[in-house]
Amino acid sequence: MGMTMTQKILAKHAKLNEVKKGQLIEADLDVVLGNDITSPVAIREFEKLGIEDVYDKTKVVMVLDHFTPNKDIKSAEQCKFTRSFAKSKGVVNFFDVGDMGIEHVLLPEKGIVTAGDVIIGADSHTCTYGALGAFSTGVGSTDMGAGMATGKCWFKVPGAIKFVLKNKPNKWISGKDIILHIIGEIGVDGALYKSMEFCGDGVEYLSMDDRFTICNMAIEAGAKNGIFPVDDKTMEYINSHKCSTMTKDVNIYEADEDAVYDEVYEIDLAKLKETVAFPHLPENTRTVDEIDKDIKIDQVVIGSCTNGRISDLEVVAEIMKGKKVADGVRVMIFPGTQKVYLEAIEKGYITTFIEAGAAVSTPTCGPCLGGHMGILAAGEKSISTTNRNFVGRMGHVDSEVYLASPAVAAASAITGKISKPSEII
């Protein structure tokens, strides 16, 4: 019986010839990741073990991105605690305000993650790195602490669902529309503890940023991980994002012809339309064409680990160029990293945003989790390029969050209601 791409990576890191769905294994780790919320708990668990040093000073990665720049005393203390630990242990890949970015945009940009890696992160959207052909998944702070000490983690080998992507998507249809469509089809538990394995001729039409977005939201379908095959675009990205702090070996895995999948879906990308997830679950999807009444919005958030990359900002700038944000609408744009921010400045995107009436912020996860910088009041509605729209996710429990692509978010910012780009371009 053959193995899926995910299973092959796990078998290699567990030093086994093969693994099977449901098998418990212990695997070597290439990266252990934490942020300013999860690292303090992991550090305390690490300290309980009585071990002097982390297993590898380059493979333990800490990014202060959630409540930064610090929003209050408690968040400042969390960051201080993490900063002190990283310094005392000589953690090389520690990213603080000024050079940090949103972690799941930053790590690929820095070349810290690559094809064939096994990565755990104390953040549920660690599944993002599957876009590079890696196995990456979110864990709790306890497993992060143990991983920092041992360089190993236990896993139950997941089953898999194959998604065969066909044909070329139309203009304005992005990775966000694709993954929202899929989640709408299978539900928020449709891939529970399974790997979402993407393949098909449609993959070649997807940019790396599209693939990052799709894998980022695999967890919103309950998946253990999402993963794409390694192709020329993947290798071009990897070769142009070399890690300066450690040597990374690229290992390419392909699913066996006789790999077993629990389900197989075919998605015709050419038939997809701009898709929005309505409150209060990512599965509550409709195309913009299916919205039968105006939904006026109070706030637009563009950015996050889902859609804070340069291609996302390029689309937003194209739509906003020469236009003004609708009266009464607050628009906040968060470049995913300092590098993305600087590139957006150099290309004139930031000027376009500010002239349109948007606020532009340093990289932060703040508004996505209702932490700071864009909290919603009771009764307010926001359209957002983030990844979750649960009750109270971005503020008051009586607020509403609609998830959409950067293109739909930008168009909505101009019209003041949920709209698609063709309505204004």
UniProtKB/Swiss-Prot annotation:
Q: Which GO biological process entries does UniProt record here?
A: L-leucine biosynthetic process
Q: What SUPFAM superfamilies does the annotation carry? A: Aconitase iron-sulfur domain (SSF53732)
* Keyword terms: 4Fe-4S, Amino-acid biosynthesis, Branched-chain amino acid biosynthesis, Iron, Iron-sulfur, Leucine biosynthesis, Lyase, Metal-binding
Query: Kind of enzyme, top EC level?
Result: lyase
User: Pathway membership of this protein?
Assistant: Amino-acid biosynthesis; L-leucine biosynthesis; L-leucine from 3-methyl-2-oxobutanoate: step 2/4
Instruction: Kindly state the subunit structure of this protein.
Output: Heterodimer of LeuC and LeuD.
Assigned protein family: Belongs to the aconitase/IPM isomerase family. LeuC type 2 subfamily.
Name used for this protein in its record: 3-isopropylmalate dehydratase large subunit
Q: Give the organism, scientific name.
A: Clostridioides difficile (strain 630)
Task: Provide the organism lineage as a comma list.
Answer: Bacteria, Bacillati, Bacillota, Clostridia, Peptostreptococcales
